[in-house]
Structure formats: C-alpha cells, structure tokens
C-alpha cells in the first residue's frame, strides 16, 4: 500500500472516530467502532481453505451468526462505558458481545470460551475474523468489560440495561429476516435461581455474621467474634446441636450482630461496607427491638417477610412458594410470538424481577412494549387475570385470552349472573324468570349493582333453589359487583371448549421455551448473583435462544402448523438462499 493510500485510510478512520465523538457531544474521544471486518484482507485463512470446506463453513451456524448477530450488534450503545480521557483505543465491543452470546449459545466456561476464540476458526469466522489468531486480548480485558457493563447498569438502574437494548435491536432484526408476525403473543413466567446455596434460617444467620466479621480489621474483634473466622467452626455451630436448640442459637447470632454493629459505630468507612450493611439489614428483618428489655429478640419463623434476605451473598433474591414448591431467587417473565403462520417463534420481550412480584404486575409493565410490538391477542394462564388488567390491555389495543382462572370458582348449582338481563352492567332489567325488579341501584364508588324483587313472586318461582337472590323479610335482593360480572364473562369464555382448546394450544409451547432456556442454556441456576448481573446474563441467554430459532428457520426446520398455513395460502415455505 502506497503512502498516499495509507494516509487516506487513516484519515477515514480518524474522521469516523470524530463523527462518533461529535454525535455523542464529545462524550468519548477514544471509542473506536469495529467495522474492519466488512473489508476482507487479501491473505487470510479462508482464502487458503479447500473450496469444499469453505462452502461448508459458509453454510454453518458461524456464517449465520456473523451475518445476523455480529453485523447487527450496535456498538454505539456501549460508548458510555469508556472514559473520555485520551488513551488506548478500546478492544472491539462487538467481539466482546459476540463472545458473551457464543458462551451462552454453546454453554462454554470462560476458560473454554477463550480457547475456542484462540483456536477454533468457526468462532473466529462468527466474530468477523478471517485469520485465526489475528486479534489477541488478555483475559483481564474481557473481565474488565463485564465489570464496566455491570457497574454502568448498577449506576443507571432505570435507563441503562445495555444488554436488553441490544436484545431489542437483534429481536427486531430477527423478526424482519424471518418474516414473523407479532400480532399474537403468549406469556408465561418461571422461577430462576442465582448462584446461591439454599439453607435454613440458622445457616443464613451464620453466613451473614461470618461475612460481617471478615469485613472488619481483626484488631477490632473481640474473642466472641474472632471464633467465626475459624474454618471448622461452621460445622460445629450449625450441626452439633439439638433441634430444640436452633432458636436459641439464632438468638445468639442476633446478639453477635448487635455486638458487631456497635464496633463500627462512628466509623463511616466500615459502616458503608456491603457486608456490614447486610448484617444491619439481617438484624432489622430477623429481629424486633424490645425497648423494655433494651434488646433485639429474634422473630418467629412465620413473622419473617418473603422479601427478607435469603442469602448473605445475594441481597436481591427473595422467597416464594408457588405450585407447592419453595423458590429462592427471581421471576422471569417472557413474551413470545405464537402466530400459526410463523415458521419459528422467538421471545420478543422479557423481564426479570423479585420472585414475589405477581404475574399481573409483570404483565402490566409489559403492556406498552407488547403494544409497540403490534400484539393484538395475548394468550396467558389464569395467574395473569384481573378485571383491571383486562381493561388496561384493552386500552393498549390488546385482547386477553386465558387458559384458566385463579380464585374461587362460582357455584355450579347456581344460575349464572348472565341469566339476568343487565343493562350496561349498571342496571338489572329482568330476572331469569322474566320478572322486573321493584327497584335497582348502582353504586359508582364501589361498583356494586343491587336489585330488589317481590317476595311473593320469588317464593313461587320454579328456579327458587338455584337463583342467586337472598330472601329477606319483605323482599328478595341480589348484590353483585361489576368485577364479578367481568370475571364470570371470562370464565364462560374459558368453559367454551373450542375457545379453551385454541387458547391452550396457543399458550402451551411457551412452557417448552422456559424448559429450553433452563435445559439448553442453564437459565434455571445462573452462575452470577444479584438482579443486575442476572438480568445481563438472562439477556444473553435469550438472544442465544432466539438465534437458535433463527438458525432453524434458515435450515428449513419449519413448524408443521406454519407449513399447513402457508400451503393453504399457496405461499410456499420460505427458505433462505444465503
């Protein structure tokens, strides 16, 4: 390359950096976008490969990943992670993000991932590298990138989940490439666990105290606290006692926690230590201060909130009993496409929250995004039902469909409210026997409708035993809320065999998606702690899952229902030619 061409090339690179810098208000001077992979070098490993092997490589997952993931990664999202000071240009962000996605796609450990990056040409090809080993980075560089990503998300909890933003951009691309319809969606939640060990209340108490003790300089500790530094003391403390002594042992830990917190009084640098803050939180959640005794007394087991601390190492994890099983960790809520004509289905939205968050709360938070995606019909189970959420969904242009309902079912030996003629759900017009009420009323404040009927007529009515009216001294009366009318309306739709069959069929496969995330991508038990890290990892795992679905599309593994649907309209089956 001549001198003039080299100068021109460097001038273009510098202008590219300056353009990005000006776009972000001079926020970064040394961020460099990695687009060199778009121009192939004349001499590279691919050019020296046997044509048959090169053709096979072009048809492999690596080529799909490069085209539909790596080339679609928006590096500009990650500009705020880098300092504006002059310094060495960043290692390519799209390579780091690509590596994270491949890690969860292939279920690699970090050690295996780095080896594959160094010596596996498919991995290099997927990351836009055409010569094996052409880009080296120290292991520490990858860990520092993860640390920046985590800390930035921690400091901007409401606006800065960069992995989620990347998920949204890639999802939009996947939908466009596969020609997916998003008009129908299904939703389900599942329980996931962070990298913590399940233990009883006493084990938790010991771990909290031991972490707090280790966080203090040994010179501050007295003999009663120093013993918790011994490696073999935990076994003696937890297991060498009778069942009847457990509560007194918990009280002993409570007393030690009080003692430890007194040692750090007046020392802000120690009080601000996360381990000490965990001790303070544990004390307030697990004990009550009795002023008369001037002492912290351990609470009974039933007095402990489900939002209380569950692990000394993960302050965000919560407890929930669901489906007869005990869960510690988080809830993951998924929204997935489910239109019959779609060749494959992908996850279009997700949310991770404390597992004490109800399905209704998560659905309510997802409605704006569902509307943005163009969802018109949403299929869920009964855990997502409430009259208010149905109204809220309708306000977003979404019709709810339920496979079942939670709560108490109406008595089967009583006439349904729908057998009464009710005008606008505010006024009783006729009873099932076609009798008009003496008077009817609607209370707008509480949404209760009432109607009074003639006692003589009701006494002679053949439907007396199954009617919902209550007999009084001078008349009969019926009270019903608008919520009850709405609920009954939904229940009647569910009991319609055809509608229920369709709804169940539409929703059922999302259970398989949950299973795939847990089995194929190890989402059931994550290797990180804290809701922020769990959210970043879950985002990478769901992108990996969606890419698997996209790969199925390109391989012609089309859903049977989609084949029938496309055949009906004579559209054929979409098969990629690239």
Which functions belong to the PLM regions below?
Residues 113-126:
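DNA-recognition alpha helix
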Residues 77-83, 125-132:
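Short amphipathic helix-turn modules centered on a small-residue break
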Residues 2-69, 464-467, 471-488, 492, ...:
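Charged, often Cys/His-bearing segments associated with DNA-binding zinc-finger transcription factors
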Residues 86-90, 104, 321, 534:
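Short, solvent-exposed segments of well-ordered alpha helices
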Residues 109-112, 131, 135, 143-578:
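Anion-binding and metal-coordination hotspots
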Residues 95-107:
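Alpha-helical support elements that line or immediately flank enzyme active sites
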Residues 59-98:
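Basic, short loop/linker segments at the boundary and entry of helix-turn-helix/winged-helix-like folds
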């Amino acid at each position: 390359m001549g001198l003039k061409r080299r100068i021109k090339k460097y001038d273009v690179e510098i202008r590219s950096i300056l353009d990005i810098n000006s776009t972000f208000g001079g926020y970064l001077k040394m961020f460099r976008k990695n687009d060199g992979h778009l121009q192939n070098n004349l001499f590279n490993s691919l050019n020296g490969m046997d044509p048959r092997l090169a053709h096979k490589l072009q048809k492999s997952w690596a080529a799909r990943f490069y085209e539909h993931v790596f080339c679609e990664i928006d590096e500009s999202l990650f500009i705020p992670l880098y300092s504006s000071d002059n310094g060495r240009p960043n290692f390519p962000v799209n390579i780091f993000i690509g590596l994270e996605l491949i890690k969860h796609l292939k279920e690699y450990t970090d050690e295996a991932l780095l080896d594959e990056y160094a010596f596996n040409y498919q991995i290099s090809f997927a990351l836009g590298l055409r010569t094996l080993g052409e880009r080296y980075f120290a292991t520490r560089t990858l860990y520092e990138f993860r640390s920046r990503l985590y800390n930035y998300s921690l400091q901007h909890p409401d606006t800065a989940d960069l992995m989620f933003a990347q998920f949204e951009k890639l999802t939009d691309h996947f939908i466009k490439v596969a020609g997916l319809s998003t008009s129908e969606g299904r939703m389900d939640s599942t329980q996931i666990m962070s990298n913590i060990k399940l233990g009883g209340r006493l084990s938790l108490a010991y771990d909290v105290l031991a972490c707090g003790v280790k966080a203090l300089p040994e010179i501050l500790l007295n003999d009663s606290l120093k013993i918790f530094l011994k490696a073999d003391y935990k076994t003696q403390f937890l297991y060498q006692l009778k069942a009847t002594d457990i509560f007194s042992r918990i009280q002993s830990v409570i007393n030690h926690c009080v003692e430890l917190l007194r040692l750090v009084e007046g020392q802000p640098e120690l009080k601000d230590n996360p381990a000490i803050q965990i001790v303070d939180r544990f004390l307030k959640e697990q004990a009550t201060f009795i002023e008369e005794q001037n002492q912290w007394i351990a609470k009974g087991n039933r007095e402990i909130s489900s939002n209380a601390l569950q692990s000394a190492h993960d302050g965000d994890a919560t407890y929930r009993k669901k489906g007869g099983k005990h869960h510690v960790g988080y809830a993951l809520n998924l929204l997935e496409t489910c239109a019959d004509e779609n060749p494959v289905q992908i996850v279009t939205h997700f949310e991770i929250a404390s597992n004490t968050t109800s399905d209704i709360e998560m659905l309510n938070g997802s409605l704006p995004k569902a509307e943005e995606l163009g969802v018109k019909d949403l299929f869920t189970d009964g855990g997502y039902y409430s009259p208010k959420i149905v109204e809220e969904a309708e306000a977003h242009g979404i019709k709810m469909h339920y496979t079942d309902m939670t709560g108490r079912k109406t008595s089967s030996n009583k006439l349904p409210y729908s057998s009464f003629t009710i005008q606008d759900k505010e006024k009783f017009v006729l009873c099932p026997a076609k009798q008009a009420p003496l008077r009817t009323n609607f209370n707008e404040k509480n949404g209760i409708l009432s109607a009074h009927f003639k006692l003589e007529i009701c006494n002679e009515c053949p439907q007396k035993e199954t009617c919902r009216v209550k007999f009084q001294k001078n008349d009969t009366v019926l009270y019903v809320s608008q919520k009850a009318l709405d609920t009954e309306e939904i229940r009647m739709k569910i009991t319609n065999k055809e509608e229920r069959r369709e709804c169940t069929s539409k929703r059922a496969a999302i259970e398989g998606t949950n299973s795939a995330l847990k089995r194929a991508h190890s989402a059931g038990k994550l290797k990180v702690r804290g809701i922020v890290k769990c959210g970043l990892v879950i985002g990478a795992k769901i992108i990996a899952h969606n890419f698997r679905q996209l790969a199925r599309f390109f391989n012609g593994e089309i859903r049977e229902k989609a084949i029938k649907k496309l055949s009906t309209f004579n559209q054929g089956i979409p098969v990629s030619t690239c």
